[in-house]
């Protein structure tokens, strides 16, 4: 069993708790400052008010002020910030993440810079991490919605990052008979597809 900490309780990050929990891992879901009502509701009855699904009993829920506790002993961290939360995640979360734990982000797509250059989110995260820090950034791409995943519909995604061994490790934690995962070191290709 591994410990997987999910930072941000949005719909997709919360949906990925299904394969993680069903694979026997300890799942910790931390809400962002905007997720306070979501976490309060989950603590009460496991019902996610925006995903409109009941999460597994046994998931541990944390408010953002409890992030440090939720990160203790984690083997994998999932970042569930939307593109609108990019600056907050880079400024507030990246500095406190342990370097020895891989990060898998659900933020899909690319950032359009002022000069028209398109940059995948993993590259933005890497550029924005604190100086001297070396987090292992990975991302999810592909046609999978939070509802499909939470409902156990067959879904196929790609995990991308620089290190294939890390990607294989992450896949081993999350793959199921309904959540199918391909791996690629072509971050740009996966993120722009």
Where are these regions (language model features)?
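Short loop/edge segments at beta-strand edges and connector loops
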Residues: 63-65, 139-141, 183-185
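Short beta-strand/turn micro-motifs composed of small residues
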Residues: 8, 31, 105-107, 141, ...
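Hydrophobic anchor at the start of a short beta-strand
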Residues: 4, 26-27, 135-137, 181
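Rossmann-like NAD(P)(H) cofactor-binding subdomain of soluble oxidoreductases
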Residues: 72, 76-153, 171
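Short acidic low-complexity segments
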Residues: 57-73
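NAD(P)+-binding Rossmann beta1-loop-alpha1 motif at the extreme N-terminus of oxidoreductases
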Residues: 1-54, 60-62, 92, 113
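Internal alpha-helical scaffold of NAD(P)-dependent oxidoreductase catalytic cores
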Residues: 96, 128-136, 154-193
